[in-house]
């Protein structure tokens, strides 16, 4: 099967990039925006940075704020009805993965109403029409949802998250402005940054990886490795580096998939409401150890990209350990816990079965059974 790369039609990067929103909307003759943003971003004036630009340019909009972390089926259903009432013709998604994922689901269902039950879009979605046009404006440096063909929805009733993979949901325009991320608190910067690191490592080692995506992932690792600590310290250079690094990781993994660190993180988020980036960060070193013997020399390049010295003189065992240790140290340095106190022995079977069924699991470089996944989860206890 041929390899493919799917990206935004247009992406703008750097401080002040949000000014391009008006330019892009006018160029496409958009008439009214459905601004999708969460209540906290509205409360702290982050959303206003974008709506001010729309106001200055005479562009109509309506704000929708029924967004929650780990968006649910109900959030999507409410959003679809709100979009219809707004009489909008495009979406401006402002926020982290939650706003982006909600926006994608809304846009897909509006364009493909036969899939009004979002559960029917799980896995590789069978839609036939492009999503309502989305201008994606990330406010976190991690999910890269602005440049991916994936979104994740929580099924509260069944205590699970499900992944929808659909080329039709790619935002037409991504506006990646580090100034939109400057208000992120330390903990959120750390967790979303570790999500980006997990994207880069899982995308680099997944079964579908190839030369072009390898290029993206290694460059992303180099940038994230030298930027995340300073971003958590709220240094401008670190913020700018993470804004770019997480986007580059998205350019890669969206086209080749991920692995069991993500499938397990999705399950932890659904059952315990663990923040996604925290769950990824806790699982990543554990999963890297499990995958090590199925990754060729890639851990040497991971270690090198993360700043480990002398990797060319290391044995296979040494550079594999060095890569895992570098990831673990970065995670600890930015304040991520290594254990999950909420995890219960009686939950392990359900967690493992859910992770095994997750859409990310087949891409893992090493096959993992339900029993394997139970043992990996147990290492968090």
Spell out what each predicted region is.
Residues 346-381:
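Short, amphipathic C-terminal "tail helix"
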Residues 271-347:
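Gly/Pro-rich interdomain helix-loop hinge
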Residues 42-115, 229-239:
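N-terminal small/polar loop signature for handling phosphorylated ligands or for N-terminal nucleophile
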Residues 1-64:
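An N-terminal, well-structured beta->alpha segment
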Residues 74-179:
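Glycine/threonine-rich beta-strand-loop-alpha-helix active-site module
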Residues 150-256:
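Carboxylate- and glycine-rich phosphate/diphosphate-binding segment that chelates Mg2+/Mn2+
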Residues 18-21, 43-46, 73-76, 98-103, ...:
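Short glycine/serine/threonine-rich phosphate/pyrophosphate-binding segments
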């Amino acid at each position: 099967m041929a390899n493919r790369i799917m990206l935004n039609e247009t992406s703008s990067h750097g401080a002040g990039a949000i000014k391009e929103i008006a330019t892009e909307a006018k160029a496409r003759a958009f008439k009214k925006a459905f601004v999708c943003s969460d209540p906290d971003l509205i409360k702290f004036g982050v959303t206003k940075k974008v709506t001010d630009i729309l106001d200055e340019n005479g562009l109509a909009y309506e704000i929708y704020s029924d967004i929650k972390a780990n968006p649910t089926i109900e959030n999507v259903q409410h959003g679809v009805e709100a979009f219809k009432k707004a009489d909008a013709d495009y979406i401006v998604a402002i926020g982290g993965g939650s706003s982006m994922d909600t926006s994608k689901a809304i846009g897909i269902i509006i364009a493909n109403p036969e899939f009004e039950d979002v559960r029917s879009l799980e896995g590789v979605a069978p839609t036939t029409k492009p999503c309502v046009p989305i201008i994606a404006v990330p406010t976190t440096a991690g999910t890269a949802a602005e440049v991916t063909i994936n979104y994740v929805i929580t099924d509260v009733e069944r205590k699970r998250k499900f992944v929808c993979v659909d080329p039709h949901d790619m935002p037409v325009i991504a506006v990646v402005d580090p100034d939109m991320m400057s208000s992120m608190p330390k903990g959120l910067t750390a967790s979303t940054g570790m999500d980006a690191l997990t994207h880069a490592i899982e995308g680099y080692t997944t079964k579908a990886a190839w030369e072009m995506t390898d290029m993206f992932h290694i460059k992303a690792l180099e940038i994230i490795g030298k930027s995340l600590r300073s971003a958590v310290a709220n240094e401008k250079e670190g913020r700018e580096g993470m804004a770019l690094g997480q986007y580059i990781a998205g350019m890669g993994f969206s086209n080749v998939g991920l692995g069991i660190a993500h499938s397990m993180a999705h399950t932890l988020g659904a059952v315990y409401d663990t923040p996604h980036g925290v769950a990824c960060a806790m699982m990543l070193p554990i999963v890297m150890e499990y995958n090590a013997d199925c990754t060729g020399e890639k851990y040497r390049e991971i270690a090198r990209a993360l700043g480990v010295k002398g990797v060319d003189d290391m044995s296979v065992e040494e550079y594999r350990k060095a890569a895992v240790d570098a990831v673990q140290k970065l995670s600890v340095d930015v304040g991520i816990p290594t254990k999950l106190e909420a995890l219960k022995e009686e939950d392990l079977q359900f967690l493992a079965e859910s992770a095994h069924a997750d859409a990310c699991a087949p891409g893992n470089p090493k096959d993992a059974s339900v029993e394997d996944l139970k043992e990996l989860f147990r290492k968090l206890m």
